Amino acid sequence: FIIPEYGFIISPQINKSTTKKPERTYRGEIYYIGDKKETVENENKELRINNHIIKIKSTSNDELVVINTSNFFVCDACGYAKVDEKHKEEGFIFDKDYHNTPYGRSCINKKLYRRTLGHKFKTDVAYISLSCYLEKEKALSVVYALLEGVSQYLGIERNDISGTLHYNRLDSGVWETNFILFDTVPGGAGHVRRIGEADEAQLKNMLMKSLEIVKQCHCGEDSNGDSACYSCLCNYYNQKHHDIIKRRYAVEFFENILYK
């Protein structure tokens, strides 16, 4: 992906202003990439809840990346870029309209390559890991329930933390699902570090609070919880996932951990 470190130069052709609001696309995705220079605040420890082993750890100065998944086609010669949703599967296109360089001259290159835009940031990170593979739809439902439960249990403002998923394959061949919770403040504010400090009783209370939130909600009762709403899992920042997250997935996950 490309990091636009120095910002953007807009087209000199300015469209006439209207009262219509710009369309929101919700194309941003956050990925955990890690940083070898991270500071481990709380070493990786294994906690047992019933017959389940859950690993938790917290770090500071850890690294994530925000990726814009729109279809940007970029000129490698001058940096010109445009969004083209008609060629989602193409690796490159030829610019039929021609384009100018930032200096106003016609660019000799007409071949535009598909690229994604992104930027890296560092913050405090907490890992809650299970040695199993959890499908994305189920794992997203769980991580959003965890964010609600952890923030309420620890008294953290909900918008001060966020989360994402990270999968890795262990040497044994077993897949590990990592629920990555992080401070939204660049550089970190110390909120999620408290997760890494938790003992078994405290972790269990966080999970029970998460279960309580999704179980007490009544959305999707006619479909056995095959939906989510703004009272349980949905919020402004996860709108792109509203069609796949389900309250039932989170309920089943936490009940399995806590009571089986």
Feature locations, PLM:
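Extended, highly charged accessory segments
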Residues: 1-260
